[in-house]
Swiss-Prot record:
NCBIfam families: PRK00702.1, rpiA. Its EC number is 5.3.1.6. The lineage of its organism: Bacteria, Pseudomonadati, Pseudomonadota, Gammaproteobacteria, Alteromonadales. This is Ribose-5-phosphate isomerase A. It comes from the Bacteria. InterPro entries: NagB/RpiA_transferase-like, Ribose5P_isomerase_typA_subgr, Ribose5P_isomerase_type_A. Belongs to the ribose 5-phosphate isomerase family. Substrate binds at T28, G29, S30, T31, D81, G82, A83, D84, K94, G95, G96, G97, K121. Disulfide bonds: none annotated. One of its GO terms (biological process) is D-ribose metabolic process. The gene is rpiA.
Length: 219
């Protein structure tokens, strides 16, 4: 199986966690795009979706899936999203696609977080993938200096503005042994909107596309 075929297998496997007549939280990225294709096959059986990015919103609307504003929704039974890295404790680095803040908000509302990845995203220790940090533009230099103090090497992601109008610093050379602690430390820096560590709200179910098929892990 190619990497994309493994992503597709994981995306379609997530359909079984979608409840009839529910509103589904939908993430962002290449693996999620396969899930959206799958979700479209049962759009008559769900009420609709809440999206974590403009890109996913456009794709779902094009496929005829109703998209709701999160503020109009009381609860989400499930949120389906990918990850850039995930460890054995279901802690993740997300935000390679710059949608981390909205992803984190939707994940917080959902009762269950189903993470869909191919097997290249599984790691023992988080941090080889640079950690994205969403930052208010005027605070960029200050936040970068604070991230250096935490042992990271922040790089401004040129030409990228988030859906919220902010910028991204990608932090390299972090060996993240305590993801929850680092998530709090970075979020405490003035000017940080949030960072791509999903440790305080990790995944509940992990679906991994492998050459042998989809493997399921639960927290």
């Amino acid at each position: 199986m190619t990497q994309d075929e493994m992503k597709k297998a994981a995306g379609w496997a997530a359909l079984k966690y979608v409840e009839k007549d529910s509103i589904v939280g939908v993430g962002t990225g290449s693996t999620v795009n396969h899930f959206i294709d799958a979700l479209a096959t049962m759009k008559a059986d769900i009420e609709g979706a809440v999206s974590s990015s403009e890109a996913s919103t456009q794709k779902m609307k094009a496929l005829g899936i109703p998209v709701y504003d999160l503020n109009s929704v009381d609860k989400l039974s499930v949120y389906v999203d990918g990850a850039d890295e995930i460890n054995g404790h279901m802690d993740m680095i997300k935000g390679g696609g710059a949608a981390l803040t909205r992803e984190k908000i939707v994940a917080a509302v959902a009762e269950k977080f189903v993470c869909i990845v191919d097997n290249t995203k599984q790691v023992d220790i988080l941090g080889e993938f640079p950690l994205p940090v969403e930052v208010i533009p005027m605070a960029r230099s200050y936040v970068a200096r604070q991230l250096v103090k935490l042992g990271g090497d922040p790089v401004y992601r040129e030409g990228v503005i988030t859906d919220n109008g902010n910028v991204i610093l990608d932090v390299y050379n972090l060996k993240i042994l305590n993801p929850k602690e680092l998530e709090d430390k970075i979020n405490a820096i003035v000017g940080v909107v949030t960072n791509g560590l999903f440790a305080k709200r990790g995944a509940d179910v992990l679906l991994v596309g492998t050459p042998e098929g989809v493997k399921t892990f639960t927290a």
